[in-house]
Swiss-Prot record:
Record's compositionally biased regions (Polar residues): 243-277, 312-347, 394-406, 419-431
GO molecular function annotation: signaling adaptor activity
UniProt-recorded name of the protein: Leucine-rich repeat-containing protein sog2
LRR repeat start and end residues: 28-49, 53-74, 76-97, 99-120, 122-143, 145-166
SUPFAM superfamilies reported for this sequence: L domain-like
InterPro entries: Leu-rich_rpt (IPR001611), Leu-rich_rpt_typical-subtyp (IPR003591), LRR_dom_sf (IPR032675), LRR_domain-containing (IPR050216), LRR_R13L4/SHOC2-like (IPR055414), RAM_signalling_pathway_SOG2 (IPR019487)
Lineage, broadest ranks: Eukaryota, Fungi, Dikarya, Ascomycota, Taphrinomycotina
GO cellular component assignments: cell division site; cell tip; cytoplasm; cytosol; mitotic spindle pole body; nucleus
Cellular compartment(s): Cytoplasm; Nucleus
Domain of life the protein comes from: Eukaryota
Keyword terms, alphabetized: Cytoplasm, Leucine-rich repeat, Nucleus, Phosphoprotein, Repeat
Biological process terms in GO annotation: positive regulation of establishment of bipolar cell polarity; RAM/MOR signaling
């Protein structure tokens, strides 16, 4: 088939597709599918008559190399699919299609996105997967409507791989985009600064390039690629260093100087960011164009050949940026980026010194040793890590390099030793990719935990003054974290000599408080990254700022103690600061519990689990720290511990155990360890549940029959009918709770372990609360509605058995802790406390309702009253059940 026939057939197919699209409609939103037609350009002539009506256009799986400005006439275009073509540059004309909402440009060969791409503010879906991108532009952070972003199978190093996580991209697209935008917005200023310096360096180096073309004619052309050694910072192609080659020279005989084959890079379309020009391989003396070099740092100094990449940049920062130096005696040698030299004269002197060494060691040996030393003692200068390295050209090596005493196996052995060094950056290739990914994630999480991103709250255009105030103090939180880390790293060498055992215990307890609060603070700051509610962020930042102040105060007290000769002089200030830290911890817990749903609803489950574990462990640490702090000072009238009551092991954990959803059980009360009391409690629970089941069954059967006005009394008020129905629903729910408690009792008797006991106490809490709710409502209705005698008798028996169970648990707790019934807890106590009993530990907030006079719980009556004046809930003073009836 001739080319004319092929073109005619293709045009006919396009006309048929256009006609089908017009027939399918709608009139002003045509859908046109021109995929798989082997198109090399857009058929603008055939689409001209409908160009203003096309809303969806598919051009996938063709051979389109570019898209011209004619596409701007497609004013209604909202969906464009140009995947699987041969685009090498992003079409600039697409950046002016403001109506575009969905763009699929995947499976092409695009290496970067233009700056004008940020004008597509209406873009909702962007798929740029399977291209050759190194970086995502920072303006993506300012696209408010972006809902889906597909970037997998690129060579992206900015953002780093643990931010551009493909697993998160598949599981939670909203969180994935939030992470991408947050990272880009935080590093936008750094990226712009480096980009501007890169362009200026390229312009200045272009002048040096022409000057060196006239003077320097003895150096082999080569490229050198170096990446920053500090992988914890953002890496973009703007930060990578490409060194320009100097032009080839000719030998005195007039022939072109030969270049070692190993120093020439192959032209590969899949090479990541290589500016290698094929003319270099043919000995062309023309340097690369400025357009090729305007993004990279340039240096006209002699350089070795660009080492071959050992791994694809798709693996990101988990792998070294260049391959290891070959062991060949004439091969290129790579030097550490940290030891960058900028003076060519220094490099020449270094070459001469190593070439004319008198010890018989070859230059290769010296360079390998220098390379190993540099990696074992890396520089911390970030600027040096991004500069180029002066290299020794292969032609400058003396003849002794070829006849060196060092053999290839010895070089390989040195390389193996260097690779196995724990201080070598290249040793990271020995680790599995999963481990490296976790390490990079931890590095990024550590950075994010030290500073909160500046969020833009679309829902709150006018943040509260307190929020602005807290944002101005975010740097202070970083100083606090640094101070805590510095203190714990230095206490081993600068610790004050301890002469008093009480002081040692107090100081160690205060350190535990400091460490716990600092860890909780960092975990909460990390959790705030997943929250976008301005109210929650305002409240949390306020309490975190208060915690910062208390941490700083405690650290200052520690420093004063270390500087003083007598450490006991500052014991009062340390104790006061420690108690203030505990108060701030309590406030943190209260606010966290209040906004727990907002903090955890959008967060990854691993972060939530880590936060809850830290909260629980911090509560245990603070609880243990209170015991040594209490006797640390002499008891006096104005002593802060004069009214302090020692808390039970379960009172402090109640807060954290509620947050952790009771994953970890609290300590068992001593009563459980007593077989006799244990048996009595189980028998009483069995009696209470049997009694409750009887009366609840009566209520469930009676209430639905009695709440019908035509069956009982037509004068019953509608609100009373609704109350009766509510009583029936509460009774049904209480019946289910009672069955669960009975089943839990059987389980605990079969498997008497600590966790089962804690679950047993939890079910007891639910049982008591349900009986209280039913009893309260029944008592309120007893003055308006006449219950049957059997129902009242059953309620009386159920409340009596519940009261006996409460008495048994309370009396068993008296033997467990005597201090719980001593002096009352002061109002200004750092941790407000419910009286510590096994029941209060199990019931939590329900313990307060048990002591309420409204339900006449026995917990509110002295123990002596139980034996002298037992007035039941549904009986009068004479024990007459009918006395409560109308």
């Amino acid at each position: 088939m001739s080319a004319h026939e092929v073109s005619s057939t293709k045009n006919s197919e396009i006309e048929r597709i256009i006609k089908e699209a017009e027939d399918a409609g709608p009139e002003n939103a045509l859908t046109l599918d021109l995929s798989h037609l082997n198109l090399r350009e857009l058929p603008y002539e055939q689409l001209e008559r409908i160009q203003g009506r096309i809303a969806r256009l598919a051009l996938g799986h063709n051979f389109i190399k570019s898209i011209g400005p004619e596409i701007l006439k497609f004013t209604r275009l909202r969906y464009l699919n140009i995947r699987s073509n041969v685009l090498r540059e992003f079409p600039e004309s697409l950046c002016r299609l403001e109506s575009l909402e969905i763009l699929d440009i995947s499976r092409n060969k695009i290496k970067q996105l233009p700056e004008s791409f940020g004008a597509l503010m209406n873009l909702k879906v962007l798929s740029i997967s399977k291209n050759r991108l190194f970086e995502l532009p920072t303006y993506i952070a300012h696209m408010p409507n972006l809902e889906i972003l597909k970037i997998e199978n690129n060579h992206i190093v900015f953002p780093p791989p643990h931010i551009a996580n493909n697993d998160l991209q598949d599981s939670d697209m909203q969180l994935f985009i939030a992470n991408i935008k947050g990272y880009l917005s935080r590093n936008e200023s750094v990226f712009r600064t480096r980009s501007e310096s890169t362009v200026s360096a390229a312009l200045s180096a272009s002048a040096n390039l022409s000057h060196s073309e006239e003077n320097d004619s003895s150096v082999v052309d080569s490229y050198l690629f170096s990446a920053p050694s500090d992988t914890s910072h953002a890496v973009s192609p703007g930060m990578l260093t490409f060194v320009t080659p100097s032009p080839h020279s000719h030998s005195p005989a007039g022939h072109q100087q030969s270049t070692p084959k190993s120093t020439l890079s192959k032209t590969n379309e899949n090479s990541e960011g290589t500016l290698y020009d094929s003319n270099v391989a043919h000995g062309c003396t023309h340097p690369p164009s400025l357009n090729q070099l305007n993004k990279f740092h340039l240096d006209a100094s002699p350089r070795q050949a660009r080492p071959r990449r050992s791994v694809s940049l798709a693996t990101g920062l988990n792998s070294p940026s260049v391959s290891k130096p070959p062991s060949s005696a004439t091969g290129p040698l790579y030097h550490s980026p940290q030891s960058s030299l900028t003076n060519s004269s220094v490099a020449s002197a270094d070459v001469q010194e190593r070439t004319h060494n008198t010890n018989g060691a070859s230059p290769i040996q010296d360079q390998i040793s220098e390379f190993t030393d540099q990696h074992q003692n890396p520089s911390n200068n970030d600027a040096a890590s991004t500069q180029s390295i002066l290299k020794t050209a292969p032609t400058q090596l003396s003849a002794s390099a070829k006849t060196s005493a060092i053999s290839l196996p010895e070089v390989a052995k040195k390389e193996r030793n260097r690779s196995n060094s724990t201080n070598d950056d290249y040793s990271s290739t020995r680790l599995p990719s999963s481990v490296l990914h976790r390490l990079e994630a931890l590095k990024e999480a550590r950075k994010l935990s030290e500073q909160l991103p500046n969020r833009i709250f679309a829902q709150d255009p006018h943040p509260s003054p307190r929020l602005k105030k807290e944002e101005t103090h975010e740097n202070g939180s970083n100083l606090t974290n640094d101070s805590v880390n510095s203190y714990f790293s230095n206490i081993g060498g600068s610790e004050v000599e301890m002469k008093h055992s009480a002081f040692e215990k107090t100081l160690e307890s205060s350190r535990g408080i400091l460490f716990s609060l600092s860890q909780v603070q960092q975990a909460l700051r990390q959790q705030l990254l997943f929250c976008s509610n301005p109210v929650v962020l305002d409240s949390m930042r306020h309490v975190l700022h208060t915690a910062n102040v208390q941490i700083k105060r405690l650290i200052l007290c520690f420093e004063d103690t270390q500087q003083s000769n007598d450490g006991t002089a500052n014991i009062n200030s340390i104790v006061n600061a420690s108690l203030s830290c505990i108060s701030s911890f309590r406030k943190l817990i209260e606010v966290t519990k209040k906004f727990l749903n907002e903090l955890t609803s959008r967060a990854d489950v691993r972060y939530v689990r880590l936060l809850l574990l830290i909260l629980f462990d911090a509560a245990k640490e603070l609880q243990n720290a209170l015991v040594p702090l209490s006797p640390s000072q002499p008891h006096s009238g104005n002593n802060i511990f004069a009214d302090q009551v020692r808390q039970s092991p379960t009172s402090m954990i109640r807060t954290a155990s509620g947050l952790t959803n009771r994953i970890v059980s609290v300590e068992k009360p001593a009563s459980v360890m007593n077989p006799e009391i244990d048996k009595q409690i189980q028998d009483q629970v069995a009696l209470a549940t049997n009694s409750a089941m009887s009366v609840l069954t009566l209520l469930i059967d009676a209430v639905p029959k009695n709440n019908q006005p035509d069956l009982v009394n037509e004068n019953i008020a509608p609100n009373l009918i609704s109350k009766l129905r509510e009583l029936g629903s509460l009774s049904a729910a209480a019946c289910d709770v009672t069955r669960k408690l009975k089943h839990r009792l059987l389980t605990f008797q079969t498997n008497p372990e600590e966790l089962e006991w804690q679950l047993f106490l939890d079910d007891t809490q639910a049982f008591v609360k349900s009986i209280i709710a039913v009893a309260n409502l029944a008592k309120a209705l007893s003055s308006e509605y006449t219950f049957q005698k059997s129902v009242l008798a059953g309620l009386s028996a159920a409340t009596r058995s519940t009261k006996d169970l409460t008495i048994l648990l309370s009396s068993s707790a008296r033997h467990y802790t005597e201090s719980s019934l001593a002096t009352p807890v002061p109002l200004m106590s750092p941790i407000a406390r419910v009286p510590a009993t096994p029941l209060s530990a199990a019931l939590g907030s329900a313990a307060q309702s048990i002591t309420s006079p409204l339900i006449m719980s026995p917990a509110a009556i002295p123990a002596s009253a139980y034996s002298t004046n037992k007035i039941d809930y549904f009986t009068d003073a004479d024990g007459n059940v009918e006395g409560l009836q109308r």
